[in-house]
Amino acid sequence: MESILTSIKKMLGIEAEYTHFDADIIMHINSVLMILNQLGVGPAEGFIIEDDTSTWSDFVPDETPVQLEAIKSYIYLKVKLLFDPPLSSSVIESYNRQISEFEWRLNVAVDPMPS
């Protein structure tokens, strides 16, 4: 399974070998992981990454591939807005709408269905 840091860097257009921004990106990833924890996604005790050794299966070992891809997209969008926000307000608004939809869908996915 791919490293969380490496895959988010790839989505941001940063080569895995380029480590100059790793501390900033890790901080933003951890902030988003905290938000996901509050939504009920991931380990109940929370989860942080410190380097490129933490993988997606460490964070969400039991998620379906579809849920995992939504989690990756959500983390990317949030980190993109924190680390390298677009200049256009319409693009920012589009990102925020996508983020809101992912939050709703991830919350529904982890909320137990009534019996």
Residues of each region from the PLM?
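Short loop/turn elements at secondary-structure junctions
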Residues: F59-S115
